[in-house]
From Swiss-Prot:
May be involved in the trafficking and exocytosis of secretory vesicles in non-neuronal tissues. Is Ca(2+)-independent. The gene is SYT14. It is a single-pass type III membrane protein. Belongs to the synaptotagmin family. Its main location: membrane. This is Synaptotagmin-14. InterPro entries: C2_dom (IPR000008), C2_domain_sf (IPR035892), SYT14/14L/16 (IPR043541). Residues 48-555 are cytoplasmic. The chain crosses the membrane at residues 25-47. Residues 157-179, 222-257 are annotated as: Disordered. Homodimer. Can also form heterodimers. Changing G439D: In SCAR11; shows intracellular localization different from that of the wild-type protein; forms a reticular pattern in the cytoplasm; does not show submembranous distribution; is abnormally retained in the endoplasmic reticulum consistent to improper folding. It is found in: Membrane.
Amino acid sequence: MAIEGGERTCGVHELICIRKVSPEAVGFLSAVGVFIILMLLLFLYINKKFCFENVGGFPDLGSEYSTRKNSQDKIYNSYMDKDEHGSSSESEDEALGKYHEALSRTHNSRLPLADSRQRNYAWETRQKYSPLSAEYDGYSSEASIDEGNCIQRMRRTPPLDELQPPPYQDDSGSPHLSCTPSEIGDSKCEFSHCSNSPRCSYNKCPSEGSTGHEIESFHNKGYEEDVPSDSTAVLSPEDMSAQGSSSQLPKPFDPEPEAKYGTLDVTFDYDSQEQKLLVTVTAVTDIPTYNRTGGNSWQVHLVLLPIKKQRAKTSIQRGPCPVFTETFKFNHVESEMIGNYAVRFRLYGVHRMKKEKIVGEKIFYLTKLNLQGKMSLPVILEPSYNHSGCDSQMSVSEMSCSESTSSCQSLEHGSVPEILIGLLYNATTGRLSAEVIKGSHFKNLAANRPPNTYVKLTLLNSMGQEMSKCKTSIRRGQPNPVYKETFVFQVALFQLSDVTLILSVYNKRSMKRKEMIGWISLGLNSSGEEELNHWTEMKESKGQQVCRWHALLES
């Protein structure tokens, strides 16, 4: 094909080459090429990174070899440097000979240390699973960096019985049990059957091939003695079990010579003219240990026997020697009948989420009381004994029944229903707290089975209008129920003498209407003299709870 009017002619392929490529195509092809190159570089980088990544959890097996290789190279270079700066007559073979000689000396100096560490690691790993070391775990050892290598060395080590020499025997023929601590800081206890006392050894483990005498240092409470021996005698657990009673192990603890249940520091002050008794509980000492009581909070309960209507309890204090310094008043204690009265003290261990536990108790008879002035004396508590019942005689010892078994009643009321109430008023906050503690001799008049009872509390003003009301939960099938529920009423100080608190005990029946077992009222319109005295004592107690038994009135 020819082009007319031109000086030269060209073929078809030359026409195609003459055409120009568009800049967009050039840019696109360049971008694709750059992208492919970047992806290739990224792939090579990632591949190289993964190849040199350490597998998690496995030690670097070549680190030790590389470190040793570097040290050898340094020694070799140092000798080569000396050879270059020294005389030129020394050949390279002689330098290599010096290098190998120095390397062998370095290896020989490090060999005993490595062997001792290897044996120590094997003994340490085996000792962790020994029953002998489990008995005396008072010594701790730190973990080594080469723990994985220690396990491998232990597998290649022959059993302990094959390594140990025959037991060393002294002049009396008694074998010695010794222990050897490793260089990483752990140590084991040893025992000497001839001295019957444990001794700890702090010496270095001898090598297997040692034939010389080793010096063992025995430390026993500051006393040091050097005893020469042929080798360290180590008894295996099988040898210990075979000896049986011949090996005397130390006791973990010495039992107390005499059990202690607590000692109260108490002060008595009796006023014969007003017929009242003031009892001050100062502190408690000689409290049992935590292992016996299981708690570290304490409370003292007091009750005047035999009537058991006047009760008191201290605040809760913590510590091994709690200090209370609280005074309680008991009224109507006639001087003519003082020989028939007694005060029972009980120390309780208080747990946050558990029931109170009696630690000890003591009944102090007022016949020992000094009727003139104060008398301070310690009251040593004794273990508590629960009595199943009591007679209706006017004997204090027979009326000192357990507080948990409320079947023991007072002489005045016989078997009438009674309720134990605790009152407390805080003048600062204006809060009246009424605690329903327990009931006694609740009866079901319609059936012979025990009743399902609850207590309803109602607070009335001076006009008889209801200010507040609340009730306890139901106690099912209990003639002597224990409630221990506290209710708080907001009463101003100037209104305290004008309010009435009514407590009603009901028997909850399923298909019938509820039945009232009895009731009492305290305050302005008190139901009796005892209830009025209880209210008056509550106002005079200055923030301390006053507990009293009250006989219920029939509806």
